[in-house]
Amino acid sequence: MENKDALDIGKDDTNTSEADVSKNETQEQPVLSKSALKRLKRQQEWDAGREKRAEMRREKKRLRKEERKRKIEAGEVVKSQKKRIRLGKVVPSSIRIVLDCAFDDLMNDKEINSLCQQVTRCHSANRTALHPVELFATNFGGRLKTRQDFVLKGQQNNWKRYNPTTKSYLEEFESQKEKLVYLSADSDNTITELDEDKIYIIGAIVDKNRYKNLCQNKASEQGIKTAKLPIDEYIKITDRKILTVNQVFEILSLWLEYRDWEKAFMEVIPKRKGILLKSDESFDVSEDTRSQSNQSDSELEKEN
């Protein structure tokens, strides 16, 4: 009896010990609530989809780059530029450059938006220039002003050396008409250097060359001198190229810094456009390429 009782007691102790262990294990692993389980499930699903989301972001980024490249090549947007480092002390120039914004009714809304960007680029280039000029925007109003106000939220009101006016350049510089020079690719006159006493006018229009001789005819009717940049003297462009308003401005600005047309052209005009330097001793083109170059030269226009 004593042995049996002893065995029973030992058995009870064993059962009690196993029950205690099981109870402790249960206490160490608390049961999650329904809300906690839902959160855990959502987290697991989120973690599982991490790679897929990353792939989607990469694809969206690739598509954005392709779309921006297309718009830049089509002239719908202006390519952003790296910040330039000034090579010397800033010394303002006495030259005045005018953006003639009197062509509001000749552009569609898309072209107005593009022109607004180009005007902003002109200011940006002038702000970082070694020899900044006084920049005027004449006949400034209509949809262009509305677009600028919408995009910039009044920031342009704080721009230095930027002078928008509803007046025409003839009204703004009434007593200095003889100093006005309208830049036009159709002019018979070629600029060799910029005159610090002159006022240079750029036709502020985005028209994909729809309006032939527009600025040249306007200036001639008003009795204003015209001139074209000496592009033909320094480079050959074997691809059709239309200079934007801001590109013309940047070329003028860089000439003031370098006093070198070739260097200014090469820094502003994209190299992918098939530029050939005439100063290059190895410059040589076949008859086919020469013919294409001559045709491109006749098509070369700024957007005016």
From Swiss-Prot:
GO terms for cellular component: cytoplasm; nucleolus; nucleus. S-adenosyl-L-methionine binds at L183, G203, D207, K208, N209, R210, Y211, C215, L229, K241, I242, L243. It catalyses: guanosine(9) in tRNA + S-adenosyl-L-methionine = N(1)-methylguanosine(9) in tRNA + S-adenosyl-L-homocysteine + H(+). InterPro entries: MT_TRM10-typ (IPR028564), MT_TRM10-typ_sf (IPR038459), TRM10/TRM10A (IPR016653), tRNA_m1G_MeTrfase_euk (IPR007356), tRNA_MeTrfase_TRMD/TRM10 (IPR016009). PROSITE patterns: SAM_MT_TRM10. Monomer. This is tRNA (guanine(9)-N1)-methyltransferase. It comes from Schizosaccharomyces pombe (strain 972 / ATCC 24843).
